């Protein structure tokens, strides 16, 4: 026989972002509880609304299975003396509720120990579930609060608990002064208390009180209602999945409705209107079949359709006030010339320790030029990027961005066009913030990518040079995100810049004033920090840490080259030949590392003594002449071909011979080969089997 179990925690309104994660955590903890208690079940269902977290365990067995547990005691030498059981043995069995007659002997690692088997009768599920309170109190949350005079902390105050095993209340469950029962609560305004007779009746009992407890069901219902409104009015209503998730997490009984606003607000740029509706009001925006924004919106009420027209009017009133502000800000911003905005940037701090936003733009202009020269970019790209760099932060002091900070860059593009800038300059201004997340969109234009790299590099270098380094999980200036974005752009545009050498150069040129005598410390941190971000990027290609280390520890810090090398190693690492190739290349790296002082100078042909030595040197010299033009794939192919020549050389020749001239000569060409190998990867980091 099996039963079902229901556990519901009634709370004050939860923040939308924690509803689903908290529900999933509760379900996992309940599942683990029954697994740990050796109680089998068929399934665990999770339920959640802003006012409750609940789980139902289906097909829960009525008792634990009996089991035998083996206990190891002291060694036989201690447990038995002169043919009689010692006090140690008697104490051991007495502690298990057994006698010395139950002892048997088994050998463990060559030593005999006494053992006993204890029969443990399974407990009834009814007895075990009395301990479920710990599941509630052990839950962890990002933020917590206290209430009343209690010191106990939880995501939100607990107001009621429903705990049923079959038809019976588990009365032993409780938290603080809240004891379990079978009374749940319906919708805050439309519903009443709901008596839950058994776990199977949970959804129905609460649905009668205007609560849909299944979050996915609410989500599907909201989607269906929006699609019906779109079909009825011949609209296109894009359904943003994040917004849909949020909306379904802040209501218990959804009813979608349409509202409208004055057409005069359509002169305001679309991103402003969309942000006002979507981000600030949690509305879904409406388009016609030509994908033009319409003066309508769709919202979702937490309730039924009673007096829904009044609800729509109330929402329209709130939105109108916000759009009126947006229209005013837009019209005022259009009256202000670019020079005025740029003047204001002189008094806008980028950071008190670093300087103004104008000073940042000056540094970024220099950086754009240095990067463009390093990357050999066309002059028209440089002109566009430098013009953008000279004004790209101007929108930060506009009225619109002051009200809608999430539109920085977007309004920069719109206003730049209005001020007469070229489309390319305006696009670069918008794109310099990209990417805004790990999987966010990247710039599509070269000037935009160039400006984005320069801006991110300046932010990173100026903060770190000034000593404001991220520590642990604390990264107040989002430097990890800045550098990861930089790495992503370099990879996407295949810009082969030795980023480590370049940043060292920049520290001495443009950021020396911030360093305050800590050049070596800051430089070491910067290089390590960049390598960590590159390693994270490589981890999207391969999960093998040895390959990641091999690539990151190579001689190159060109991100595209490193990513390509990682792909090559990931592809060839499972081949039969890879172990032999790696071992051959490692012999070269290892012997060269031990004798670097002897490896300088020119390779002397007259000192080559054997055929294998001459063959290897010829191959090294040929490879060295073209290594700069080879892709990582091509370079590995050459190293693969060279591996047998390396083995032949080591089989026939000794490197560390007594003759100094011969020894030095061999170390020279092996040192050269080692550098070529390390340009691809540090093979000594690889684990081969």
Give the role of each language-model region.
Residues 1-689:
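Amphipathic alpha-helical "coupling" segments that flank catalytic cores
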């Amino acid at each position: 026989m099996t039963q079902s179990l229901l556990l519901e925690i009634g709370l004050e309104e939860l923040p939308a972002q924690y509803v689903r994660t908290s529900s999933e955590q509760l379900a996992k903890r309940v599942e683990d509880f029954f697994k740990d208690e050796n109680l089998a079940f068929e399934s665990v269902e999770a339920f959640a609304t802003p006012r409750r977290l609940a789980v139902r365990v289906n097909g829960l067995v009525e008792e634990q299975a009996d089991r035998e547990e083996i206990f190891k005691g002291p060694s036989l030498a201690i447990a038995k003396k002169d043919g009689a059981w010692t006090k140690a043995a008697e104490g051991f069995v007495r502690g298990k509720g057994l006698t010395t007659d139950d002892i048997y002997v088994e050998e463990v690692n060559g030593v005999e120990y006494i053992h006993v088997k204890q029969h443990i009768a399974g407990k009834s599920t009814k007895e075990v579930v009395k301990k479920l309170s710990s599941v509630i109190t052990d839950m962890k949350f990002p933020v917590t609060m206290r209430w009343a005079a209690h010191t106990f902390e939880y995501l939100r105050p607990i107001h009621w608990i429903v705990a049923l095993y079959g038809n019976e209340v588990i009365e032993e469950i409780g938290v603080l002064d809240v004891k379990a029962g079978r009374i749940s609560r319906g919708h805050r305004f439309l519903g009443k208390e709901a008596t839950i007779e058994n776990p199977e009746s949970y959804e129905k009992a609460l649905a009668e009180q205007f609560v849909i407890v299944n979050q996915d069901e609410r989500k599907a219902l909201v989607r269906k209602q929006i699609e019906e409104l779109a079909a009825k009015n011949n609209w296109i209503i894009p359904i943003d999945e994040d917004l849909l998730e949020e909306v379904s997490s802040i209501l218990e009984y959804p009813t979608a409705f349409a509202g409208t606003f004055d057409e005069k607000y359509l002169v305001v740029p679309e991103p402003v209107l969309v942000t006002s509706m979507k981000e600030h009001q949690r509305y879904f925006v409406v388009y016609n079949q030509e994908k033009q924004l319409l003066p309508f919106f769709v919202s979702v009420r937490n309730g039924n359709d009673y007096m829904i027209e009044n609800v729509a009017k109330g929402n329209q009133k709130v939105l109108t006030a916000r759009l009126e502000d947006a229209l005013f800000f837009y019209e005022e911003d259009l009256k202000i010339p670019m020079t005025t905005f740029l003047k204001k940037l002189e008094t806008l701090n980028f950071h008190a320790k670093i300087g103004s936003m104008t000073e940042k733009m000056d540094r970024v202009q220099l950086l754009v030029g240095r990067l463009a020269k390093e990357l050999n970019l066309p002059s028209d790209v440089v002109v566009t990027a430098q013009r953008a760099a000279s004004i790209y932060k101007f929108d930060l002091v506009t009225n619109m961005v002051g009200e809608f900070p999430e539109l920085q860059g977007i309004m920069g593009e719109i206003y730049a066009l209005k001020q007469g800038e070229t489309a390319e300059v305006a696009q670069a201004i918008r794109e310099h913030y990209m990417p805004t997340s790990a999987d966010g969109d990247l710039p599509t234009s070269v000037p935009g990518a160039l400006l984005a790299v320069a801006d991110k590099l300046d932010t990173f270098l100026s903060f770190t040079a000034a000593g404001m380094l991220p520590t642990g999980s604390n990264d107040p200036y989002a430097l990890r995100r800045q550098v990861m974005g930089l790495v992503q752009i370099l990879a996407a545009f295949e810009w082969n810049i030795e980023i480590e050498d370049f940043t060292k150069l920049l520290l001495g040129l443009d950021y020396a004033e911030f360093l305050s005598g800590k050049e070596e410390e800051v430089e070491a941190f910067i290089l390590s920090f960049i390598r960590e971000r590159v390693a994270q990027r490589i981890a999207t290609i391969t999960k093998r840490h040895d390959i990641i280390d091999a690539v990151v520890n190579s001689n190159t810090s060109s991100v595209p080259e490193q990513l390509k090398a990682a792909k090559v190693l990931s592809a060839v690492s499972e081949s039969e030949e890879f172990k032999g190739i790696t071992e051959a290349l490692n012999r070269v790296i290892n012997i060269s590392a031990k004798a670097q002082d002897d490896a300088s100078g020119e390779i002397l042909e007259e000192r080559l003594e054997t055929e294998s030595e001459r063959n290897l040197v010829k191959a090294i010299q040929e490879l060295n002449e073209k290594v700069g033009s080879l892709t990582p794939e091509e370079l590995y192919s050459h190293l693969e071909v060279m591996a047998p020549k390396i083995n032949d050389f080591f089989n026939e020749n000794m490197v560390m011979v007594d003759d100094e001239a011969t020894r030095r000569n061999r170390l020279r060409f092996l040192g050269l080969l080692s550098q070529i190998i390390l340009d691809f990867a540090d093979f000594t980091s690889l684990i081969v089997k």
